Amino acid sequence: MERLTVTLGERSYPITIAAGLFNDPASFLPLKSGDQAMLVTNETLAPLYLDTVRSVLEQSGVNVDSVILPDGEQYKSLAVMDTVFTALLQKPHGRDTTLVALGGGVIGDLTGFAAASYQRGVRFIQVPTTLLSQVDSSVGGKTAVNHPLGKNMIGAFWQPVSVVVDLNCLKTLPKRELASGLAEVIKYGVILDGEFFSWLENNIDALLALDDTAMAYCIRRCCELKAEVVAADERETGLRALLNLGHTFGHAIEAEMGYGNWLHGEAVAAGMVMAARTSERLGQFRAQDTQRIIDLLKRAGLPVRGPQEMSAQAYLPHMMRDKKVLAGEMRLVLPLAIGSSELRGGVPHDVVLGAIADTQQAQQ
C-alpha cells in the first residue's frame, strides 16, 4: 500500500493507493458509523462498483444513498449537477453529509463542485476510477463543470477529505481511457521531472500492460509531484499553472469538437506537442526533445496532432477564454527542457498559429 499526504494545514488529506481498497472499510475514513453519505457515480460504473462500495460503507454503519448520472464529458454541466442537489434535498442530507465521488474526472469534478456548493460546503471523498483521475483531477481541489463556451469555467477550489485509489479499477478501463490518462502522466515528466520522463520511456509498455508494481509507482510519483505543487500554490497563482501544459490548446480542441468527441487526455497530448513547437519557435526548446515527447505519446497510443478539420485560427477564440489569460494577454505553459517549464505571457499569436501549423503538417 502506498500512502502520501497533501499538506494544506488543517485541510491536509491522505491519498491511499493499493489494489483491493474497495473491500476495506478503513479506506473510506473519515466516514464512520452513524455518518450520512451520498455516493455519486455514473451509469457505466454503477454495475461494476456501486454495490461493493455501498456494502463496505454500510458494514461500517454509514447511512448510504446514491445517485447515478449519465456517463460522458457532455454531462459535466450545471443541469446534471442539479440532479445531485435534488437527490440530496429529497432525503434530506444536511451539512454533516459526505459526498463520495465514485468515477473518473467528470464525476470527481462535478461531485466536488456540488460538495463546495451544497449548503455552502460539505465534505467529499474522491474515489477515482480512471488513470487520468487517479494521477491528476482527484488531487488538488479543483472542481468545476463545463460551459458551452469553455471547459471548467464554472467551479470552485474545494479540497476532498481523502483520495482512495484502488488499482483494480484499471482492469475494467477501456484502452482508450488508459491512454488518455497516460497523457497526464507524461505531462508530469515534461514539466517537472526529467528522470520520471526517462523512467516512462523505459516502462511505458509495463504501464500499458497494467503491471501492478509499475502502475503503483507511476501513480504515486504523479501524486507526489502534484501534492508538492498544490501545497505550494493551492489557488493556481503561479507554480500550479505549470500543471496545465498542453491544456490551453487541448481545451480549445475539446470545446471546438464538442465535449466527449476527443477525450481530455487525447486533446492534452496534441496540445503538449503544440506547446513544444511553440517553445521551439521561441528558441527555448530543442527539436530533439519535442521528438522525445512525440515518440512517447505515440507509444502510449495517443494523438500527436489536433483534428485535421480544425483550422489553426479556430484555436484562438477558445484560447483567449482560457483561465490563465491575464489583462487580455494569453499566457501559455511552455517546456524549457524535459523536466523544466515556465508560464509565459506575451507569446505573439503568429508564433502560436505557426506552432499549430507545424504540429499539423510535420512528419512525426
From Swiss-Prot:
Pathway this chain belongs to: Metabolic intermediate biosynthesis; chorismate biosynthesis; chorismate from D-erythrose 4-phosphate and phosphoenolpyruvate: step 2/7
Its predominant location is cytoplasm
What does the UniProt cofactor note say? Binds 1 divalent metal cation per subunit. Can use either Co(2+) or Zn(2+).
State which Enzyme Commission number(s) the record gives: 4.2.3.4
The prosthetic group or cofactor this protein requires is: Co(2+); Zn(2+); NAD(+)
- GO annotation (BP), single: chorismate biosynthetic process
Name this protein carries in UniProt = 3-dehydroquinate synthase
Enzyme class, first EC level, given as a word: lyase
Give a yes or no for keyword rRNA processing in this entry.
Answer: no
| Gene Ontology CC terms, in alphabetical order | cytoplasm
* Recorded family membership: Belongs to the sugar phosphate cyclases superfamily. Dehydroquinate synthase family.
Q: What Pfam families does its record include?
A: DHQ_synthase, DHQS_C
By its UniProt entry, which NCBIfam families does this protein fall under?
aroB (TIGR01357)
Residue positions binding NAD(+): 71-76, 105-109, 129-130, 142, 151, 169-172
Decide whether keyword Cell membrane is in the record. Answer: no
Q: Where in the cell is it found?
A: Cytoplasm
* Catalysed conversion reaction: 7-phospho-2-dehydro-3-deoxy-D-arabino-heptonate = 3-dehydroquinate + phosphate
What organism does the UniProt record list as the source?
Klebsiella pneumoniae subsp. pneumoniae (strain ATCC 700721 / MGH 78578)
Binding sites annotated in the UniProt record for Zn(2+): 184, 247, 264
Q: Which GO terms describe its molecular function?
A: 3-dehydroquinate synthase activity; metal ion binding; nucleotide binding
Function of the protein: Catalyzes the conversion of 3-deoxy-D-arabino-heptulosonate 7-phosphate (DAHP) to dehydroquinate (DHQ).
Q: By which gene is this protein encoded? A: aroB
Q: Which UniProt keywords apply?
A: Amino-acid biosynthesis, Aromatic amino acid biosynthesis, Cobalt, Cytoplasm, Lyase, Metal-binding, NAD, Nucleotide-binding, Zinc
